[in-house]
């Protein structure tokens, strides 16, 4: 079935993902309610989102909904089931989905590192300028100021003495 996703949201009681879409055959706006079963405050949001997106009943409807958005909706549901307020859950999701430039990525485990890398890849794709963009300039020339006094680093002066 051909459809265009318009909005995707979550209902807490009873838990369900709600998709508002436009049917391309008749052009009508419709609503699809996909119940969330066997999900608790200890469930993995990524796994639940993948299972819902790959479910044969809902697959054709969720093609245009990103996996990241479904994960976020499941995170809201998990926060609700844990007893957190909506503001607390939003703050927690914001912390998880942003990259701290001062954070040492060498200290993260493999799962967290993969998550951070996927966030960085997504940000790169979003900010990347493509040839078709209206503000795209092919050859940018930048002139750097020429200071008379160049600052040298300690290891530069040490290696210069060796030669």
Swiss-Prot record:
Pfam entry (one): CEP19
GO biological process: cilium assembly; microtubule anchoring at centrosome; vesicle targeting, trans-Golgi to periciliary membrane compartment
Keywords in alphabetical order: Cell projection, Cilium, Cilium biogenesis/degradation, Cytoplasm, Cytoskeleton, Obesity
Location (main, coarse): cytoplasm
GO cellular component terms given for this protein: centriole; centrosome; ciliary basal body; cilium; cytosol; nucleoplasm; spindle pole
InterPro entries found in the cross-reference section: CEP19
Keyword check for Cytoplasm: yes
Protein localization: Cytoplasm, Cytoskeleton, Microtubule organizing center, Centrosome, Centriole; Cytoplasm, Cytoskeleton, Spindle pole; Cytoplasm, Cytoskeleton, Cilium basal body
Keyword Cytoplasm: yes
Record: disease: Morbid obesity and spermatogenic failure: An autosomal recessive morbid obesity syndrome characterized by hypertension, fatty liver disease, insulin resistance, and decreased sperm counts. Variable clinical manifestations are early coronary artery disease with myocardial infarction before 45 years of age, type II diabetes mellitus, and intellectual disability. Morbid obese individuals are defined as having a BMI greater than 40.
Protein family per UniProt: Belongs to the CEP19 family.
Subunit structure: Interacts with CEP43; this interaction is required for its localization to the mother centriole. Interacts (via residues 121-150) with RABL2B. Interacts (via C-terminus) with CEP350; this interaction is required for its localization to the mother centriole.
Main function: Required for ciliation. Recruits the RABL2B GTPase to the ciliary base to initiate ciliation. After specifically capturing the activated GTP-bound RABL2B, the CEP19-RABL2B complex binds intraflagellar transport (IFT) complex B from the large pool pre-docked at the base of the cilium and thus triggers its entry into the cilia. Involved in the early steps in cilia formation by recruiting the ciliary vesicles (CVs) to the distal end of the mother centriole where they fuse to initiate cilium assembly. Involved in microtubule (MT) anchoring to the centrosomes.
Protein name from the UniProt record: Centrosomal protein of 19 kDa
């Amino acid at each position: 079935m051909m459809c265009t996703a318009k909005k995707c949201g979550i209902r807490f009681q009873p838990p369900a993902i709600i998709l508002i879409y436009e049917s391309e055959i008749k052009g009508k706006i419709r609503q699809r309610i996909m119940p969330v079963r066997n999900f608790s405050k200890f469930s993995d949001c990524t796994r639940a989102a993948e299972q819902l997106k790959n479910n044969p009943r809902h697959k054709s409807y969720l093609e245009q909904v990103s996996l990241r958005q479904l994960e976020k909706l499941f995170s809201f549901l998990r926060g609700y089931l844990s007893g957190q307020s909506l503001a607390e859950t939003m703050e927690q999701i914001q912390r998880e989905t942003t990259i701290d430039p001062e954070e040492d990525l060498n200290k993260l485990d493999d799962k967290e590192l993969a998550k951070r890398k996927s966030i960085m890849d997504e940000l790169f794709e979003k900010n990347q300028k493509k040839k078709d963009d209206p503000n795209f300039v092919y050859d940018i020339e930048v002139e750097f100021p020429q200071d008379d006094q160049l600052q040298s680093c300690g290891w530069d002066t040490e290696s210069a003495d060796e030669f």
